[in-house]
């Protein structure tokens, strides 16, 4: 996921933290943001992965990024990610004549989370199904898709964008984490997702934005 130029206070990537401890984001504003080699490596991998998906989709003018972090392993694993995306796109074509695919799509979920936005690595929309795919280059912690709040927030943003254009009744979320040989997929009905958004999510997001709660 390419980092937006503006950082959301209640980011999707930190949702697991502020949903559990709503006052945390406001407290963290008092501490300077820092980066790490792992984070910089992840940014480089995401940029390379984005380039390869664009190329696979026929966008030959999309510029190839350069980074000192690029290596044989990164080349191989971003190839795997690109291949997986194309497999899912081909799969979507079996259920819809002309499915929509978007790469590094800015998603606005501020209807539920104050000033909430994020960037979806890949979004595929077909009849009745929305598929959100997130590329994780980290190898320290295995990430699962089941009830993953980051993925659910991305899904809400995509539904806000495409829900009136497609008859979507199910959301599929996938974590693609190649350095841990992890492809984790989870499916949730749109009705269930919206119930969570309008109850637990909204309540805790409002508390977190105000720096309240416990």
Each model region followed by its residue ranges:
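Metal-dependent nuclease catalytic cores that hydrolyze phosphodiester bonds in DNA/RNA
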Residues: 1-130
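Cysteine-cluster motifs in flexible loop/terminal segments that predominantly coordinate metals
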Residues: 21, 25, 207-214
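Mg2+/Mn2+-dependent nuclease catalytic core
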Residues: 97-212
């Amino acid at each position: 996921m390419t980092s937006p130029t503006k950082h959301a206070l209640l980011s999707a990537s930190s949702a697991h933290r502020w949903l559990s401890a709503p006052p945390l984001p406001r407290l963290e504003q008092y501490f300077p943001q820092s980066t790490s080699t792992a984070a910089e490596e992840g940014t480089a991998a995401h940029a390379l992965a984005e380039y390869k998906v664009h190329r696979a989709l026929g966008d030959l003018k999309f510029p190839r990024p350069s980074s000192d972090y690029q290596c044989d392993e990164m080349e191989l694993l971003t190839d795997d990610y690109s291949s997986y995306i194309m497999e899912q796109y081909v799969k979507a074509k079996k259920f819809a004549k002309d499915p929509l695919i978007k790469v590094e799509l800015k998603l606005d979920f501020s209807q539920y989370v104050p000033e909430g936005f994020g960037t979806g690595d890949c979004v595929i929309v077909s009849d009745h199904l929305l598929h959100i795919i997130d590329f994780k280059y980290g190898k320290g912690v295995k990430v699962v898709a089941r009830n993953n709040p980051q993925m659910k927030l991305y899904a809400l943003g995509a539904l806000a964008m495409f829900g009136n254009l497609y008859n979507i009744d199910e959301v599929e979320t996938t974590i693609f984490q190649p350095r841990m040989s992890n492809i984790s997929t989870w499916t949730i009905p749109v009705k269930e997702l919206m119930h969570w958004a309008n109850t637990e999510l909204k309540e805790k997001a409002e508390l977190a934005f105000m720096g309240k709660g416990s």
